[in-house]
Amino acid sequence: MYKKISMNDKEIEHAINNEVDRQNEHIELIASENYVSEDVLTAVGSVLTNKYGEGYPGKRYYGGCENVDVVETLAIERLKKLFGVKFANVQPYSGSVANAAALATLASQGDKIMGLDLASGGHLTHGYKISFSGIFYNSITYSVNEDGILDYEAIKELAIKEKPKVIICGYSAYSRIVDFKKFREIADACGAKLMADIAHIAGLIAGGVHPSPVPYADIITSTTHKTLRGARGAIIMTNDVEIAKKMNRWVFPGYQGGPLFHAIAGKAVAFGEALKPEYAAYAKSVVYNAREFSNYFIKQGVSIVSGGTDNHLFTINVNKSYGISGLQAEKILGKFNITVNKNTVPFDELSPAVTSGIRIGTAAMSSRKFAKWKELGAIMHEILQNCVEFSENESKHLDRIAELKKQVEALTTEFPIITKY
């Protein structure tokens, strides 16, 4: 379990300790969240936060960088080993910054880019109209088919017709294996560069349970805090020396100034943890648990986008299955200490602020070695079935609500947060 802290600033101490309680006592099913180790927390909270050092190891614009050079070099070398790449940048503050730098590396303002649309499982930074990617680039989108699965032939036809400068593959809510080889063939067919955003599946790739884009993509981006189980931030990788030079310039001085060395240290620690043999077992458990969990809902007749999962997440169409919105589902589950996020489904008729679905991920609870997925599924199924009744007539169901909360509490107690990996 995470431990509470003591600070002179009692207001911030109170907020942090409340969050410690929340994380310890809640079932965490947000697919983009995980639990970092004590070592990662120590690195992120270290004196490295005091150091400024624009530039790269050995080529800084500030003095006194000998120790942070060691930290950043370790992060780079560990990352290169983890994914089998020749060049890596560990400085991006976030996935959005990494994607901005990667797109700028491969395309110019106004060029055409092609990514999966948001409702189908794409990300804001893959060309959504209110994102920089949709404002500074001419964005066109591909989508999944009626079954919620990528249709590679349809994507190829669109790419040949539109001739984008960059094709983006890798998603925030797609539950099936991404065929990077087919995307390479599509990119070659239309003369495009291929950008793989593996933010969600990076840890699965590192653990050997999802194919790698390294042999096929021109440039690869990822966050470090999802399945990689690291400090918050991002990375960019490539095997092309010229692309590496450009991406480094776009990170600094293009989009960022001084690196966050405390965060880079946290990334380095997480990369080291992911290089251990035990990490492969963790990645395998994440996928197994996601299938086990999704299969419970499928057996209850619940609508799952694409009909199941091959990775760490799946999306439930709660509008179709329970007659409620994703927002309603997120709120009612939250009252029972089960944390999810509302999410659009393919061809969603509800707005992104409301949605028809909820996205479920198993990365965080797998870090706790959680093993009672059917029991959790039954609790969630009952809550979602009774969402309106529990919300509007709570006083009539106090005993049952209390019992369900007690069951959730028992699960979090049985499977506490693990802080050493």
From Swiss-Prot:
Residues with PTM N6-(pyridoxal phosphate)lysine: K226
Gene3D superfamilies noted in UniProt: Aspartate Aminotransferase, domain 1, Type I PLP-dependent aspartate aminotransferase-like (Major domain)
Site (Plays an important role in substrate specificity): H225
One GO BP annotation of this record: glycine biosynthetic process from serine
Binding site for (6S)-5,6,7,8-tetrahydrofolate: L118, G122, H123, L124
Keyword Amino-acid biosynthesis: yes
Pathway the protein contributes to: One-carbon metabolism; tetrahydrofolate interconversion; Amino-acid biosynthesis; glycine biosynthesis; glycine from L-serine: step 1/1
GO MF annotation list: glycine hydroxymethyltransferase activity; pyridoxal phosphate binding
Protein function: Catalyzes the reversible interconversion of serine and glycine with tetrahydrofolate (THF) serving as the one-carbon carrier. This reaction serves as the major source of one-carbon groups required for the biosynthesis of purines, thymidylate, methionine, and other important biomolecules. Also exhibits THF-independent aldolase activity toward beta-hydroxyamino acids, producing glycine and aldehydes, via a retro-aldol mechanism.
Protein name: Serine hydroxymethyltransferase
